[in-house]
Amino acid sequence: MTKPIITFNNVSKTFEDSGTQVLKNINFDLEEGKFYTLLGASGSGKSTILNIMAGLLDASSGDIYLDGERINDLPINKRDIHTVFQNYALFPHMTVFENVAFALKLKKVDKKEIAKRVKETLKMVQLEGYENRSIQKLSGGQRQRVAIARAIINQPRVVLLDEPLSALDLKLRTEMQYELRELQQRLGITFVFVTHDQEEALAMSDWVFVMNEGEIVQSGTPVDIYDEPINHFVANFIGESNIINGTMIEDYLVSFNGKEFESVDGGMRPNEPVEVVIRPEDLQITLPEEGKLQVKVDTQLFRGVHYEIIAYDELGNEWMIHSTRKAIEGEVIGLDFTPEDLHIMRLNETEEEFDARIEEYVEMDESEDGLINAIEEERNEENL
């Protein structure tokens, strides 16, 4: 990893008036030029992290570093960080030009330089020619672009975005996701984005921090977070999941619904209780006799790109299936899946415990492979 641009070291936050602890020992390093997302439900602590990073809130304990310099006591205007707020915080009585140029005027930048940089920045956010437009006459998407232009005109090291797309309609929000991601990659500025929208986080980010009750419960690439959730909360929060109680018989063999199935997971105790995750899109509908499981279709909804089918097995477990084929309500169908479609989770395992287990398991696996290779080499020498 390259030198981090921002570091949180055991950062906690408790509001003194209520005694409520909203952050618990937050630790992370952010690299320069990447798109990070803090993802969580309302009250999870994600906006508190953003406000501490910006200097709008003080941490109760722990250290915050920018480029290796401790900034806990550094004033907001001394931090090379800019925030785009949910309500955009634009000046309604000013024009687009005046809003974007505001920070440069405070720094007493030359008028010609201001005009040049405002024009360049508005072009970046596709608002060229809007310089004299009143803020009050702009659409929601246009106001969003003005707020972003104002944030990047000073070329800060870090841009913080506090749910800036939440007020936009679905189509415009999707368009802005593409624009924000493309802009961040073009500028090479570190973006830290806050959202409760899982699809938004997965679509835009290089790295996602999933938060719950003031803690980071899992962090990783969008693919890691989606394909390898470490516990029930993450699996249930990120996308749709079928989560079934099971037993890990041994490495690569799991039991649930009274049957044994091959898997690709290992490193757990023999006969350890586990939870099995199968994503709805990984379940294939078959004839009942051809399926690994049999379920009875209860209801279905057409979602445009697929049917969302709810079915129940004989044990009463609910199954969600995404299929391009329409099912018949009341019909018994088979469900097929591969070992790779099963993700096995230990009960209540933390990210630290998960990482330690995987590291130990990989080392053990490599050691066994080395022993097998040594035995085979010895046999080959004896045969010569």
Curated annotation (Swiss-Prot):
Transmembrane segments: none annotated. Pfam families: ABC_tran (PF00005), TOBE_2 (PF08402). Residues 6-238 form the ABC transporter domain. Part of the ABC transporter complex PotABCD involved in spermidine/putrescine import. Responsible for energy coupling to the transport system. ATP binds at G40, A41, S42, G43, S44, G45, K46, S47. It catalyses: ATP + H2O + polyamine-[polyamine-binding protein]Side 1 = ADP + phosphate + polyamineSide 2 + [polyamine-binding protein]Side 1. It is a peripheral membrane protein. GO terms for cellular component: ATP-binding cassette (ABC) transporter complex. It is found in: Cell membrane. Belongs to the ABC transporter superfamily. Spermidine/putrescine importer (TC 3.A.1.11.1) family. The keyword Membrane applies. Its EC number is 7.6.2.11. This is Spermidine/putrescine import ATP-binding protein PotA. The keyword ATP-binding applies. Keywords: ATP-binding, Cell membrane, Membrane, Nucleotide-binding, Translocase, Transport. GO terms for molecular function: ABC-type polyamine transporter activity; ATP binding; ATP hydrolysis activity.
